[in-house]
């Protein structure tokens, strides 16, 4: 059994969607290097990620990205103690590229392989800069594929207390941006347009605002489409600002309710939507008002990256040991599914 401590170095690999990434992390939180190659331009003209294109791009980028991560870290393969890779959820073809690379390196070096849950890794993204947190902690995971309110009771111990019943927050951003002709990815595009608009111009609905901990954004998306079709001369910037405010209002309200329910004094954000400027601003103000601690990932750690994969892998190795060598891609993996022995 490998000894896991602050000197343990993990090579992390990420390829779940449209970013090819590799990183070297020591002790779970000390990021020695983090390299990300994005495929945004390759998918932009299609208005979304094309799985076949993504897989081929990962194959082309994987070796150079890993080589660059090692070079930037200043260490060689001989110093790597374990290799971690995203096994799911994600696009199956894309996942297989990263998993195959990681398992091959682990086998060649005779080092442990750790299959990492991509959702769990997003929980650790905020902790890379601020690892000393108090549990229980509420993690608000908001991305293109998921919107989850997670009670993080300790490292590796989670329960989902709220989630979307239809569209994820990031998915709603993408769909509204596409409808408004703002391009892909939608989150940053909406954020940019919203800064130039009036957030009070349109009163869009806040679905399920007072009901439980689950969220719903499908109705909001439909409301935006219907409003614009009835008012074609409306400012796109006002629509973006009003839509974004509606999403953030729901996320903040649900987060406060969930944090009080579990007795958390710390809230952490994770996922691509955690980069949204209004969400960060409003969550900061709310936590200050409540006397809570807010843990925010750096902007670079909001989007998919391998540093969070290596970090989550380190914690999994510490708690549960390595994954089975037979583990493959698990495209439908849930947050609470195990990836280690």
Q: What are the language-model segments listed below?
A:
Residues 1-8, 116-138, 312:
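Conserved phosphate-binding catalytic cores of ATP/NTP-utilizing and phosphoryl-transfer enzymes
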Residues 2-8, 15-16, 23, 33, ...:
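A short helix-loop
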Residues 7-79, 85-89, 118, 122:
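N-terminal beta-alpha supersecondary unit
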Residues 12-13, 84-86, 117, 138-143, ...:
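Short beta-strand segments
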Residues 49, 79-125, 130:
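Glycine-rich phosphate-binding loop and adjoining helix at the ATP-binding site
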Residues 76-87, 262-273, 295-298:
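Short glycine-rich phosphate-binding loop at a beta-alpha junction
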Residues 115, 283-309, 323:
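Conserved phosphate-binding/catalytic loops in two-lobed NTP-binding clefts
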Residues 192-267, 277-290, 317-320, 337-341:
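A contiguous, well-structured pocket-lining segment that forms one wall/lid of small-molecule binding clefts
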């Amino acid at each position: 059994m490998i000894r896991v401590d602050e000197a343990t170095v993990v090579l992390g690999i990420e390829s779940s969607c449209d970013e090819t990434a590799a990183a070297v992390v020591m002790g779970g939180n000390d990021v020695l290097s983090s390299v990300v190659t994005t495929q945004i331009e390759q998918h932009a003209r299609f208005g979304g990620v094309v799985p076949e294109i993504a897989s081929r791009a990962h194959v082309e980028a994987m070796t150079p990205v890993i080589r660059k991560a090692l070079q930037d870290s200043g260490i060689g393969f001989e110093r790597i103690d374990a290799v971690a890779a995203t096994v799911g959820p994600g696009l199956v073809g894309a996942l297989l590229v990263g998993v195959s690379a990681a398992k091959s390196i682990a086998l060649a070096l005779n080092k442990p392989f750790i299959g990492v849950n991509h959702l769990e890794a997003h929980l650790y993204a905020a902790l890379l800069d601020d690892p000393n947190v108090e549990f229980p902690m509420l993690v608000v995971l908001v991305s293109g594929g998921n919107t989850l309110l997670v009670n993080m009771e300790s490292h590796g111990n989670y329960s989902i207390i709220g989630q979307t019943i239809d569209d994820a927050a990031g998915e709603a951003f993408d769909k509204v941006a596409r409808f408004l002709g703002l391009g892909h990815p939608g989150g940053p595009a909406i954020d940019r347009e919203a800064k130039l608009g009036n957030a009070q111009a349109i009163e869009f609905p806040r679905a399920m605002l007072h009901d439980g901990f689950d969220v719903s954004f499908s109705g909001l998306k439909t409301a935006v489409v219907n409003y614009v079709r009835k008012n074609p001369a409306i400012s796109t910037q006002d629509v973006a600002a009003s839509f974004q405010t509606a999403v953030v209002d729901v996320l903040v309200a649900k987060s406060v309710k969930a944090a009080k329910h579990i007795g958390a004094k710390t809230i952490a954000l994770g996922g691509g939507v955690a980069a949204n400027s209004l969400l960060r601003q409003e969550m900061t103000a709310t936590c200050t008002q409540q006397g809570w601690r807010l843990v925010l990932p750096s902007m670079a750690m909001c989007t998919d990256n391998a540093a969070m994969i290596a970090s989550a892998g380190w914690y999994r190795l510490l708690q549960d040991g390595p994954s089975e060598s037979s583990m493959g891609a698990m495209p439908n993996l849930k947050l609470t599914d195990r990836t280690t022995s």
